[in-house]
Amino acid sequence: MNGEDIFKSIVSGEDQSILGDVARAGLSLLSKGYKKAVTMRNAKFDANKGVVKVSVPVISVGNITAGGTGKTPMVRLICDILGQKGFHPTVLSRGYRAKDNSQNTIISKHGTILVEPEESGDEAWLLAKVLPKSSVIIGRNRIESARIAIEELGADYLVMDDGFQHRALHRDKDIVLIDASNPFGYEHVLPRGLLREPMEGLARADIIVLTKVDQVDPGLVAALRKRLARMAPQKPVYETIHKPRAVYTLEAWANGDEGHPIGTDVDLPIMAVSGIGNPKSFTKTLEGCGYDVVHTMGFGDHHDFSDDDVVEIWKQAFAHQAKAIMITEKDAVKLSQLHTFEDLKIPILVLSIGIEFISGKQEFIENLEI
């Protein structure tokens, strides 16, 4: 169990030990200070202080909890939609885990990738790879990134990745993603829970998208909708699933070659390996495709894989008699850079995942219009 798993076992209440109780009490005290600071910050932005509006439309994609909710595939979908309408969107990413995100760096220009993954961070580089007609810029200063996008790249639309709490840049549409399997981060703000801000902040959202609704009971989804109707009245709520798009060999994915249809390798017992916010969700997605998942190895979100990790992955695959290893696209960004991983004598497969609407996609597209 890694540090992230230990933390989640504490804040979720799964750890019922005395130490777990003590930890929760301490985290609750810290949460009070965090909540006060966030509330004061939000009050400033609610008064429109320190907010900069740029000359082109801005769409923000974010969430209210820490961890993965599906922002990357949603940003990809929005850029594809805008591209089909004839626009030239640029993605503004913070560049989490980039070598230096204090600088504003152009990662890709109209589909041409300009830097290596370690310079940009895994998520920004993945977006640059899968958006052949868009540009990607990283940097903590989103206002400066917006200026570069407009003046140097000719952007006529900006898509701010993970932007719900980055309020200094005015946005014309605020899209909030909520993971239906853990919608409100154990009902507490950080660090006692996973909420980045109090749930009342959802009232700022223009559009709410529930993700992974296929991984929870329909009754829970209905209850979640009722709760959202109270917290964010009159705001449209859409239900989506994480829909696998294709499977690639690691070499084919790295080279930009074609993948093959989902289900081609379902006869192979596979081991799921991921360094994402919700490894169990990845396993459920694979099982939903018919794959025989014999073992799951979950690392921390944005994990920096090492040669030692590769050795352990191989040992676990051998111990569980896996005939292939399945990884996410985000992890493929880093693992494709490790020669030891490429040398494993077992097929390495990459699952590409997109967002699919249960219903209301056309209405969602219309609501994007500014």
Where are these regions (language model features)?
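Walker A (P-loop) phosphate-binding motif
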Residues: 42-111, 215
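Phosphate/Mg2+-binding loops and adjacent switch elements
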Residues: 87, 96-235, 239
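Short, flexible loop segments at boundaries between secondary-structure elements
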Residues: 243-245, 300-304, 344-370
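Conserved beta-strand elements of the Class I
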Residues: 88-92, 176, 269-273
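C-terminal accessory "lid"/substrate-recognition subdomains
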Residues: 1-14, 183-321
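Acidic beta-strand-to-loop metal/phosphate-binding motif
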Residues: 323-330
